Amino acid sequence: MPRRILVTSALPYANGPIHLGHLVEYIQTDIWVRFQRMRGHECYYVCADDAHGTPIMLRAQQEGVTPETLIDQCSQEHQADFADFAISFDSYHSTHSAENRTLSETIYLRNRDKGHITTRIVRQAYDPVKGMFLPDRFIRGTCPRCDALDQYGDNCEVCGATYSPTELKEAISVLSGTPPIERESEHYFFKLNDFEPLLKRWTQGGHLQPEMANKLNEWFEAGLQDWDISRDAPYFGFPIPESTDKYFYVWLDAPIGYLASFKHLCDREGLDFDSFMTPHSTAELYHFIGKDILYFHALFWPAMLHGAGFRLPTAIFAHGFLTVNGQKMSKSRGTFIKARTYLKHLNPEYLRYYFAAKLGSGIEDLDLNFDDFMSRVNADLVGKVINIASRCAGFINKHFQNRLADRLVEKSLFQKFVAASEHLAQHYEAREFGHAMREIMALADQANRYIDEQQPWVAIKDPERKQEVQEVCTLGLNLFRQLMIYLKPVLPMTTEKAEAFFNSQSLTWSDVDTPLLNHTINRFEPLMIRAEKIKIEAMIEDSKEHLQQNTNAVKPTALLAEHPIAETIQFESFAKLDLRIARILKAEQVEGADKLLRLELDLDGETRQVFAGIKAAYAPESLVGRLTVMVANLAPRKMRFGISEGMVLAAGPGGKEIYLLNPDEGARPGMRVK
C-alpha cells in the first residue's frame, strides 16, 4: 500500500553560498526521497532558506541593501545550486514568508495559552555604540577558566568551558570594538521541562539513531532548562504577538519553516495540510539533519509541536560532518569548495555517487578523498556500469538496425539481477547507501564477465553467429537497464539519458523484472566521461583564487579592528610561558563532549594529556603524527573528562575555523619555542 511521506532537510542560512559540506545532507535526503517515489509512494520533499537573525540584518546594513533584498538574492543562488545538483525539492520556500509567520504565531500562542511560555528579566550584553543587545557570538574576550584569548561570549574553543558573556574577561563587541555594558530586558521563555516525560518517551521510542538517543540522556540527566525564544529590537524576524520590540528567536521560527514550506506546497497543489500534521495522522514525517543541531530538533521541536496540538516526527536522521582529504575543509588549501565552484569543473553526479558510496545510517563523518573520488567514479561508474552499454550498444546500432532481440538468451542471469531488488530496496530504505552501491557494483561485475565470456566482437565476424550477438548484446543492455534502475535515486540525470537511449518512459523500481525485448533503441551516445585529475586540481585552485579575491576585498586592518592587540607586556612576562614542540601520538573523541578531542602529546620522553576544543575542525585520525606547539608549563586543570596537562596553540575564530600551529620541517618534540 502506498505510503504518504513528508521529508525535510535542514534549512541553509541565507547569508552565504552552499558548499560541499552542506551537500552531504541534501544529496543523502534526495537519494532517499527519489527511492521512495520510485517505489510508488506519495513522497514530498520540502526545504527553505533560514532567513532571519542578527547576522543577516548586519550584513544587509554593510552592503547597503534591505534584508529582504539580501535573502532573495541568496535564495536564488541556493536554488540554482540545488537544481544543478538534481536536488528534487517539491517546495523550496523561505522562513520570511506569510505562511511561516502565521504558523509561528499559531504555535507560540497555543503554547502560551496552555501555560508553556513564561517571562523574566535577564541581564544582557549591550553595545552602546550600535544601540543593540549582542548575541553571544558577537562578543569576544578572554576565557574566564583558562585565560585563552579571543574566545566567544558563550564558550571557549580551547578548554571547552561554557559560561555567560558577563563572565568573559576583557570583553569587546565585535561590531564596534568597544566593551559592552550590562542592561536588563524582559525575555520570553519556552518551558521545556513541562514536556520532559513526553520527550523521554519519544527520544527512547525508536525515533532517533541509538547514539543520538544516548546523547540526549545526558541532557535529561542535567535537567531540561527553559529556552529563551525572544530577541530584542533591532532584529530581522517576526514580532512576538502582543509584545513591544520583541522578536521570535531565529531557532523558534526556523524549524516551523518546514511546515511553512509544506503549507506553501499544499496551497499550490491542493493538498490537505492537516492530514499530514494532526496528532493521529497516518502520514510519515522525517527530518534529515546534521548531528550538531540534534538538541533543537529532538527536544525543542517535538515539544513545541506537541504543545501546539501537532503531530511529532516519525524519525529524525542525523549525519556526520564532511572532511576533505582527512582534514576539515580549508580555504587556504582550496578544499572549502562552494557548490558553484564544483559545478564549474566537475559532473555533479560524480559527487552524488561518491557520497552515496560512503554514506550509511550512522553519524560518522564522511571524508572526501580526491584520489579515492576519482578512482571510484572512473572504476565504478565509467569502467563498470557505463561500460556495459558502450560494449553492447554499438553492435545493436550497427548490425541490427537498433533492434533488440525478442528473447533473453540467459534468463537465469537476468533473474539474478531481479532477485537483488528487495535486498537493495532494504538498503535504500535503511539509508545504507554504501551497502547498496557495493552490491550494485558486484552485479555490474557479473554483467561485464558475461560479456567477456561471450566475446560478441569475435562472434560478429562469423555470419552464422549473428543472431547470437544480437541476443548477447540484448541481455547485456537489459542488465545495464536494471543497474540504471537501481542507480536512478543516485544518478537521476544519467538515468534520464539512459531512458532516452532505450527509447522508453521514465523507469520505476518495478520495471526491473520486465525485460526490454523486440524493441527499437536509439543510437548510443556517451553517458558519462571519466573524472580527470586536472579538473579536480583546477577546482581546488579556483577555490584558492576565490579566497584570494575575498582576502583582497577586506581591508588589511579588519581583523585588528575586530580583535585589537592586547596590552603591551614585558619580555619577562612572555618568558614565563614555556612553549614546546610536541608530536601528537594519539587523538580521539571524548564521550559526552561536543567540542573536545583528547590528545596524547610527546615532548621527547615525556607524554602529556591535553583536551583541546578542536573537534569541529579536525578528524582525530588526521592529527596523529603531526607536530604542534603546546604551553608546557600551564597548571594542570581538572575537567569532567580528566586532567588536561597543557594547551595546544591554534588560530581562528573557533568552530570549524580553527587552525593548529604547525612547526616547520626540522623541528623536533621537546624543542622550546622562543
From Swiss-Prot:
GO terms for molecular function: ATP binding; metal ion binding; methionine-tRNA ligase activity; tRNA binding. A motif ('HIGH' region) lies at residues 12-22. Pfam families: Anticodon_3, tRNA-synt_1g, tRNA_bind. It catalyses: tRNA(Met) + L-methionine + ATP = L-methionyl-tRNA(Met) + AMP + diphosphate. Binds 1 zinc ion per subunit. Zn(2+) binds at C143, C146, C156, C159. The keyword Metal-binding applies. Residues 573-674 form the tRNA-binding domain. PROSITE patterns: AA_TRNA_LIGASE_I (PS00178), TRBD (PS50886). The keyword Endoplasmic reticulum does not apply. GO terms for cellular component: cytosol. Its EC number is 6.1.1.10. It is an enzyme of class 6 (ligase). ATP binds at K331. Its cofactor is Zn(2+). Is required not only for elongation of protein synthesis but also for the initiation of all mRNA translation through initiator tRNA(fMet) aminoacylation. HAMAP family: Met_tRNA_synth_type1. Homodimer. Belongs to the class-I aminoacyl-tRNA synthetase family. MetG type 1 subfamily. This is Methionine--tRNA ligase.
